[in-house]
Amino acid sequence: MIQTLADMRRDYTRDGLSEANAPDDPFGLFRQWFTEATQTEQAPVEPNAMSLATVDADGRPHCRILLLKALDDRGFTFFTNYDSAKGQQLDASPYAAMTFFWPTLERQVRIEGRVEKVTAEESDAYFQVRPLGSRLGAWASPQSQVIRDRAELERLLAETEQRFLDKAPHCPPHWGGYRLLPERIEFWQGRPSRLHDRLDYRLVANGWQRERLAP
């Protein structure tokens, strides 16, 4: 029997999230959860995969999956083509939201805030540790632009490979990182009967304010 969408569900059984076990600083809790996710989640789940939501000039939302590539006390860093659709949207409206979901742990983290470009030095440092194919692809692909077919993309890649045949590809000027500076971070822990735990951290004048939200 084919299961209908209305019947598709699972119950959550793991331990809850209490204020007593949650630090005052959300970065500490995120690092703890992220470490546990890297130790627990298995392929095909990528623990650093996240959905990134942006809005265009008309206020229409757009969402896609990216990988978190750096985390410090300033915020959450990802890299992309600055000329891509997301890059243009962030130029027009420098705010975004990201969501991490770790199904084995039955956890979700939502993050909202302002976005800024990282320094050229930070972008270059990460670019240089990427696999060669990824570095060549950053030069070859006119991301988010219409191309005729796959053959055109492969032709662009072949031309790029010839261009860098005798030298290592450097970081393109149209490619680099963004850092999301969080103003709100919500931690969600699945619980039985859909009575989930939600702890919401909001940045206020004197630090972070933590509140519990109804599921």
UniProtKB/Swiss-Prot annotation:
Binds 1 FMN per subunit. Gene3D superfamilies: Electron Transport, Fmn-binding Protein, Chain A (2.30.110.10). Its EC number is 1.4.3.5. Belongs to the pyridoxamine 5'-phosphate oxidase family. Homodimer. HAMAP family: PdxH. This is Pyridoxine/pyridoxamine 5'-phosphate oxidase. It comes from Stutzerimonas stutzeri (strain A1501) (Pseudomonas stutzeri). The gene is pdxH.
